């Protein structure tokens, strides 16, 4: 038996090919692989990464787990699984990220990057919340933090709060009210998220208010997932450590999403669930 693990998202796709013991014997990389936003492009990149990882090895028995952005869109996930020439489970990247971070242990994951999600793994079962995207949520994320500062700048211009040095700086960069409005109409989550590091490092009152609001959202999400006996929290994402709370014990991540996909591919119970 050989195993294939794939981690794919908007920024790229990675694949590993492993022997029966889990030893990685091939790796491949390719382009964006969000199967909900562009199925054909994602399929091409996924197949390219897998073919690169496999090389010229002719394996008769293969099991694969693919953790992909957009896999919550069931028709796309089912179509991809049917297209692959070996048994495959296509799951959300959240599933493989949590398994990679926690291994088989119980715990909570708080993933704070451009977007955000929170998940609990308890007795082998996962439950995730968040991950709705900036328009509907992604509370506490880099995009949410940046947008919150933009909203505060607008409210400051209306007189609801003070125009602090940081807000004045932002408004000057945007060329004032009209520029702020124009930016907001076309800004992607990544556009808003680029302001987050500046906010997290600033002592400006507006930055402190936004940071406090972000941490309140993060605290509420983790508290919602915590069972009666609190679990340790593993922080993921580029902003995870910058927003980490000391309310619960912390535990470093064991591995990444690709590690999680490989572990699930090798786990017999995952294939019978």
State where each predicted segment sits.
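ATP-binding/phosphotransfer module of carbohydrate and carboxylate kinases, centering on a glycine-rich
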Residues: 1-58, 100-108, 150-273
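Broad gene-expression machinery/nucleic-acid interaction feature
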Residues: 12, 63, 115
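Short beta-strand-loop/turn "lid" adjacent to the catalytic site in phosphate-handling enzymes
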Residues: 29-35, 50-90, 185
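Phosphate-binding/catalytic loop of phosphoryl-transfer enzymes
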Residues: 67-162
């Amino acid at each position: 038996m050989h195993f294939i693990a794939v981690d794919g998202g908007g920024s790229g796709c990675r694949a590993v090919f492993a022997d029966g013991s889990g030893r990685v014997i091939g790796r491949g990389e390719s382009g964006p692989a969000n199967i909900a936003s562009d199925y054909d492009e994602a399929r091409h990149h996924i197949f390219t990464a897998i073919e690169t990882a496999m090389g010229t090895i002719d394996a008769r028995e293969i099991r694969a787990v693919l953790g992909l952005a957009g896999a919550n869109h069931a028709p796309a996930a089912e179509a991809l699984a049917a297209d692959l020439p070996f048994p495959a489970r296509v799951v959300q990247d959240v599933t493989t990220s949590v398994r990679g971070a926690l291994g088989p242990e119980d715990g909570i994951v708080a993933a704070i990057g451009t977007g955000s999600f929170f998940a609990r793994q308890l007795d082998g079962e996962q439950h995730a919340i968040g991950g709705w995207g900036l328009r509907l949520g992604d509370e506490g994320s880099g995009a949410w933090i940046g947008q919150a500062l933009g909203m505060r700048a607008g409210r400051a211009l209306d007189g609801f709060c003070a125009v602090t040095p940081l807000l004045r700086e932002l408004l000057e960069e945007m060329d004032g009210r009209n520029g702020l409005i124009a930016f907001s109409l076309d800004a992607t989550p990544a556009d808003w998220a680029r302001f987050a590091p500046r906010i997290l490092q600033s002592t400006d009152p507006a930055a402190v208010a936004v940071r406090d609001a972000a941490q309140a959202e993060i605290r509420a999400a983790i508290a919602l997932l915590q069972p009666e006996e609190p679990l340790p929290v593993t922080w993921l994402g580029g902003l995870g450590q910058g927003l980490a709370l000391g309310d619960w014990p912390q535990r470093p991540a064991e591995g990444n999403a690709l590690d999680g996909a490989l572990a699930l591919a090798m786990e017999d119970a995952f294939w019978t669930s």
